């Protein structure tokens, strides 16, 4: 079976075609600027040159129509007909409390996804547009939803509840949900394989460090805690998100800067984090370069970043009662040598010792701990699309 993996954003559609006989990727692509003048489709078929098509597309249905045309194109397609696609897997950011695993999409599933529009307004609506576009164009195959929140649904109330009046949980389901679950799931399972232990017997801390960043503590095959919360704003310092702050700062700055709630939401999600602290960029590569040139704000931003990650490592080791491995993944985690080194510095007392020479790699699956480190330190490139393809295949076959 061949599976089409779709990740629909507000103005983009990312896709892959995966042949499940050997899990090979037959094509990857991106439709960018959907509904905006200047739409482009970049399509990279296996063993062929990348193709770029420029064509304005009014909506996600038009975008998916173009994707399907490209997939069967005689010159640069990867399949002969759409009959070869046995199922479609959709990334959905928020499944609320309703889903602890991936599911075949039906009317009830779509109702729950729509219920979560209010708590995931930037992600769930375009995810749903992608689902409905694909269902219109491919009505005879199974469509599967794979939720970013699902992996974290094993958390207990001690870690998912906030100390707010209990009725806000009962009425509005205000609680910690966590995100990046598909990535945490993939690298945690790979880490167990690298440890040579059953996954259900491991204590693992996963660090998904990208422009958005989150960590998870996994024990006996279950997430017990994760750093993102009710929304992806909570937790680590990120590219443009503040992460953990005193909630009173929100009200103070709304008053001082004359912001309404929407403007405040934008302020803490889009103007804060490493961008706000450094004044340089949201990109850690730029901030590292600026710090190396003597920029004091960039240095402070990096110190705040390292401090926050270290704090979560200590927190999670306490909750796990020890740890077998740390796992670095995502754009920063896989590629930023200096970031990894500084995060792991001075953690010897916890049994975490990095080999700085082994650490000088990017994008490879490797153990960078010293031989005598009690805790292994793994770099594992994430593969969310493969998880989506596998779940889709298993539910559709």
Swiss-Prot record:
EC id: 2.7.2.1
Sorted UniProt keywords: ATP-binding, Cytoplasm, Kinase, Magnesium, Metal-binding, Nucleotide-binding, Transferase
A GO cellular component annotation in the UniProt record: cytoplasm
Ranges annotated as spanning the membrane: none
Residue numbers binding Mg(2+): 7, 384
Entry binding sites for ATP: 14, 208-212, 283-285, 331-335
Site residues by UniProt (Transition state stabilizer): 180, 241
Cofactor requirements of the protein: Mg(2+); Mn(2+)
Chief location category: cytoplasm
PROSITE patterns: ACETATE_KINASE_1, ACETATE_KINASE_2
Reaction(s) catalysed by this chain's protein: acetate + ATP = acetyl phosphate + ADP
Transferase as UniProt keyword: yes
Cystine connections: none
Active site per the UniProt annotation: 148 (proton donor/acceptor)
Binding site for substrate: 91
InterPro entries on file: Ac/propionate_kinase, Aliphatic_acid_kin_short-chain, Aliphatic_acid_kinase_CS, ATPase_NBD
GO biological process: acetate metabolic process; acetyl-CoA biosynthetic process
Cofactor note: Mg(2+). Can also accept Mn(2+).
Cell compartments where the protein resides: Cytoplasm
Top-rank lineage group of the source organism: Bacteria
This protein's record includes keyword Coiled coil: no
Pathway: Metabolic intermediate biosynthesis; acetyl-CoA biosynthesis; acetyl-CoA from acetate: step 1/2
Family affiliation: Belongs to the acetokinase family.
Subunit structure: Homodimer.
Its job: Catalyzes the formation of acetyl phosphate from acetate and ATP. Can also catalyze the reverse reaction.
Protein name per Swiss-Prot or TrEMBL: Acetate kinase
Organism: Syntrophomonas wolfei subsp. wolfei (strain DSM 2245B / Goettingen)
């Amino acid at each position: 079976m061949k599976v089409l993996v779709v990740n629909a954003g507000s103005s983009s559609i990312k896709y892959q075609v995966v042949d499940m006989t050997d899990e090979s990727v037959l094509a990857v692509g991106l439709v960018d600027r959907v509904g905006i003048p200047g739409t482009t489709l970049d399509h990279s078929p296996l063993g062929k040159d990348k193709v770029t098509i420029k064509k304005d597309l009014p909506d996600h249905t038009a975008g998916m129509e173009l994707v399907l045309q490209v997939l069967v194109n005689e010159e640069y397609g990867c399949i002969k007909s759409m009959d070869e696609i046995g199922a479609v897997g959709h990334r959905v950011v928020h499944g609320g409390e309703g889903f602890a695993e991936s599911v075949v999409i039906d009317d009830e599933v779509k109702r729950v996804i729509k219920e979560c529009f209010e708590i995931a307004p930037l992600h769930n609506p375009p995810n749903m547009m992608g689902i409905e576009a694909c269902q219109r164009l491919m009505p005879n195959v199974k469509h599967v939803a794979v939720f970013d929140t699902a992996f974290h649904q094993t958390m207990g109330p001690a870690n998912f509840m906030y100390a707010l009046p209990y009725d806000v949980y009962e009425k509005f389901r205000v609680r910690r949900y966590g995100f990046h679950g598909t990535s945490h799931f993939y690298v945690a399972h790979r880490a167990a394989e690298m440890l040579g232990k059953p996954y259900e017997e491991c204590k693992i801390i996963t660090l998904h460090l990208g422009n958005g960043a989150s960590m998870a503590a996994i024990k006996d095959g279950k997430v017990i805690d994760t750093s993102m919360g009710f929304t992806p704003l909570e937790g680590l310092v990120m590219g443009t998100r503040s992460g953990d702050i005193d909630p009173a700062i929100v009200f103070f700055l709304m008053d001082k800067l004359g912001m309404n709630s929407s403007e405040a939401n934008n302020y803490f999600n889009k103007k804060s984090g490493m961008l706000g602290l450094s004044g340089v960029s949201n990109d850690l590569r730029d901030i590292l370069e600026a710090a190396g040139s003597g920029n004091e704000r960039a240095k402070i931003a990096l110190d705040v970043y390292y401090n926050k990650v270290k704090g979560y490592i200590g927190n999670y080791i306490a909750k796990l009662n020890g740890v077998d491995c740390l796992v670095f993944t995502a754009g920063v985690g896989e590629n930023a040598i200096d970031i990894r080194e500084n995060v792991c510095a001075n953690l010897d007392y916890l049994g975490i010792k990095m080999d700085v020479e082994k650490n000088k790699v990017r994008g490879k699956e490797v153990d960078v701990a010293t031989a005598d480190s009690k805790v292994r330190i793994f770099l594992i490139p994430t593969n969310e699309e493969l998880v989506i393809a596998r779940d889709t295949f298993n539910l559709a076959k």
